[in-house]
Design a protein with these regions (language model features):
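Catalytic-site neighborhood detector that most strongly recognizes the C-terminal catalytic loop/helix
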Residues: 243-258
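N-terminal core-binding DNA-recognition domain of tyrosine recombinases/integrases
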Residues: 1-76
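Basic, Lys/Arg- and aromatic-enriched nucleic-acid-binding interface segment
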Residues: 82-111
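Short basic/aromatic active-site micro-motif
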Residues: 207-228, 234-243, 247
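The alpha-helix within a helix-turn-helix
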Residues: 103, 114, 242-243
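Active-site/catalytic core of tyrosine-dependent DNA strand-transfer enzymes
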Residues: 155-221
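DNA breakage-rejoining catalytic core of tyrosine-based enzymes
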Residues: 70-87, 148-158, 175
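Conserved tyrosine-mediated DNA breakage-rejoining catalytic core shared by Y-recombinases
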Residues: 116-162
């Protein structure tokens, strides 16, 4: 539990025994990109036992939500070239194609497409931000809610932002994807439905699929090239990309460069 205690102290300014079930779930969501399912389950069970017997934050019949690890998915996925992504979007329905373009342009996870908001509508979480963040990327400022409830800024090219705003819903709607609830503000594809559409189009047109997560690999690799080409050293570029993608760990950025 030492790692959980460090997280509680560093990110939440509380002790281990003060952590709530909701905060524990946020921690596990963040860890899901860093470790495999076995380790993630062991950490969840350790936190759960602590909450049952020590902090009493959970009743004996209550359980922490089981979080699926994305670590293997990140390791296995590979990037797509811009040309390959164009081929994929051309064979998708407009709603799915727009989501693919948005995910590629801003390095989004599939579920983050549900959470897109203009930046003036919602503030961002307090996290480190280097001055060179988004350097070389023009566009409109939006936010998404990512792993662990973290709200971060993303940059969307103006022509895509215009298409997105044309899909703004008259009223936000509640949607559920993979048992998680979201409030959606735009009529675009996201989550499981978008990922399935992406994989089908990739298999049909390219003869195989690296999965929708490959779009994030493409973003990471393109941004690393852009930043280094502008004179920024590799270590700093890794840190910038980690901030833009919402994991804030340069070593995780490395896994996207395979």
């Amino acid at each position: 539990l030492s790692r959980v205690a460090q997280y509680a102290n560093r990110e939440l300014s509380i002790g281990l025994r003060e952590i709530t079930p909701e905060q524990a779930t946020q921690y596990l969501e963040i860890r899901s990109e860093e470790v495999g399912q076995k380790t993630l389950d062991m950490e969840r069970q350790a936190i759960q036992a602590m909450m049952h017997f020590t902090s009493k934050k959970l009743n004996q019949d209550e359980r922490l939500a089981v979080i699926k690890s994305e670590h293997q998915q990140i390791l296995k996925s590979r990037s797509y070239t811009p040309e390959q992504l164009n081929i994929i979007t051309e064979s998708q329905r407009p709603q799915n194609a727009l989501s693919t373009q948005l995910a590629h342009a801003a390095g989004l996870r599939g579920h983050e497409l549900f959470t897109l908001r203009r930046i003036e509508e919602r503030g961002v979480s307090d996290r480190p931000a280097l001055a060179e963040k988004f350097q070389g990327r023009e566009g409109e400022r939006y936010t998404v809610q990512g792993k662990g409830g973290l709200i971060r800024e993303v940059r969307i090219p103006t022509h895509l932002a215009n298409q997105l705003e044309a899909q703004r819903l008259p009223e936000p709607k509640h949607v559920t994807d993979r048992t998680i609830n979201y409030i959606q503000h735009y009529k675009i594809s996201a989550g499981r439905a978008w990922a399935a559409s992406f994989s089908r189009a990739s298999e049909k047109k390219l003869g195989g699929s690296e999965g929708a997560h490959g779009v994030r690999h493409s973003y990471a690799q393109e941004r690393m090239y852009e930043l280094q080409n502008s004179g920024i050293n590799r270590d700093k570029a890794l840190e910038i990309v980690s901030q833009e993608m919402g994991h804030f760990r340069p070593d995780i950025t490395e896994t996207y460069l395979r």
